[in-house]
């Protein structure tokens, strides 16, 4: 899929901005798709339950959500019954053109989790999931406004803050 608009069309979501979208997977039509390559950045929040994980000497239940980060050109299995793609969750899709010329565009390489393997996905707690969902909501609220000369800057800053929180959440995995 080359554009965010094409992604929206494939998943049955409305395009509010040509370069960025927040997609509710519980409302998405996954029936006609299998493996799809995205030509844009994709953050996938799966709200499907998973097992408790051991960090340090304790078990922590981070089954409230899992984050997967895809760089442009990466593929994911979109089969509805696939363990790789959830039927409940959210996608934040943003094209590299959105962040071009922004601080996020200059620093996107610092968010190394975009090059991690699927088994290195970030398992998050309920509190962390709420933070991610708040940013998804803020981005979506901005997308529901008419596009103006401030839209790109505001949306890219929200995405950058979301990614900064994700760095914090990844680092938490190695502290606990």
Please provide the spans of the model-predicted regions.
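Histidine-centered metal-chelating micro-motifs
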Residues: 50, 68, 73-79, 99-100
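Short acidic-glycine-tyrosine-enriched beta hairpin
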Residues: 57-71
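Generic protein-terminus/edge-of-domain signal
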Residues: 1-54, 58-60
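An amphipathic alpha-helical interaction segment
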Residues: 130-176
